[in-house]
Regions:
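Acidic, surface-exposed loops and disordered segments
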Residues: 1-322
Length: 322
């Protein structure tokens, strides 16, 4: 069970909030090569907090010690649509992945302990430097993408993602212990349309957002030759995990962070369509057993039934070229 964070730092370490950092002003040449480990880690935090969170609440707090960074869930910014902390932890996983890439870029191995203290479940991860290493070319590209990446609400899709890129996106999520289902070309149009209907239903039940529904309707019904965009060039991706607990949510966040960076390298815009997975009003009668004990939403269960090979649905994404 996740609990509220302590409000006072310990005497041997200090907390670093996002507001105390200046990530948009950071320059890599200013990395304190000869500084203390704690100074180097604090510098690298600027890259971790550049990432987007699912509810745009930046639900993390970093605690810097002499030789490590501790990543905590900041439950004080909890969104009402995320009462079981699932998306909060996923968002923290994105920040964790960016921090790991920054550590590698500056020439160190990253050592990560997830949930290192069972009695302190708010502590999601402890990150420290390993031995010196040579940065890999792919890591350089991913690092450069951190400062450029952004998620968008909707962009009109004008061409298909190449199969080679789709394969790469599959591989990056697999490397973070999740499984990804691509809802384009390999899935019948009937299933794709059903997923879009679930997004619309989730929105209507959750927020009653007319602008979102209008954009969604335009996406489903293209005026060009009467071809539904959802069954032509729009690319939907469903990230799922083999388990449905805090460990799986953190791994999902790291996979999503990797995917967002890789997509950004090719100028692919990413939107989160997670409403059918969020809806609290549509709780299934079947309970799933990891505290806090919650019920899997019926809409989420329908996604799981549509794509059983994807495990537990965690994040539904729309990817396209602008």
């Amino acid at each position: 069970m996740i609990h509220p964070l302590p409000r006072k730092p310990s005497t041997t370490s200090y907390y670093k909030s996002t507001s105390a950092l200046n990530p948009r002003l950071v320059e890599e040449d200013n990395f304190p090569v000869n500084g203390k480990t704690s100074e180097q880690l604090e510098f690298l935090l600027n890259y971790a907090v550049l990432n987007p969170s699912i509810h745009n609440t930046q639900p993390w707090v970093f605690k810097i010690t002499d030789d490590a960074i501790e990543l905590y869930a900041n439950t004080r910014v909890l969104a009402t649509a995320d009462s079981n902390y699932r998306e909060l932890i996923i968002s923290c996983g994105i920040a964790l992945f960016d921090l790991r890439i920054a550590i590698r870029y500056f020439g160190y191995r990253d050592i990560v302990e997830v949930f290192p203290e069972p009695y302190n479940p708010n502590l999601l991860a402890r990150i420290s430097f390993g031995s010196k290493r040579i940065v890999q070319l792919e890591e350089k590209f991913l690092f450069r993408a951190i400062s450029k990446r952004s998620t968008e609400r909707f962009y009109p899709a004008n061409r298909n993602l190449p199969k080679s890129l789709i394969s790469e996106l599959e591989s990056v999520t697999d490397s973070e212990c999740t499984r990804l289902q691509i809802l384009t070309s390999i899935v019948p149009d009937s299933s794709r349309r059903e997923v879009i209907k679930l997004v619309d239903k989730g929105d209507r039940l959750q927020t009653k957002d007319p602008l979102f529904r209008q954009k969604l309707s335009q996406w489903i019904n293209s005026n060009h030759e009467d071809i539904p965009i959802a069954s032509s060039v729009a690319t939907l991706m469903l990230i799922g995990s083999q388990n449905d607990n805090e460990y799986a949510w953190l791994a999902t966040g790291e996979a999503l962070g990797h995917l967002l960076l890789r997509a950004r390298i090719d100028d692919v815009k990413v939107s989160c369509l997670n409403r059918p997975i969020q809806v609290p009003e549509l709780r299934d009668s079947a309970l799933w057993g990891f505290p806090p004990l919650k019920r899997l939403s019926r809409v989420r269960s329908r996604l799981q039934a549509l794509f059983p090979d994807c495990g537990y649905p965690q994040i539904l994404l729309h990817l396209c070229y602008q």
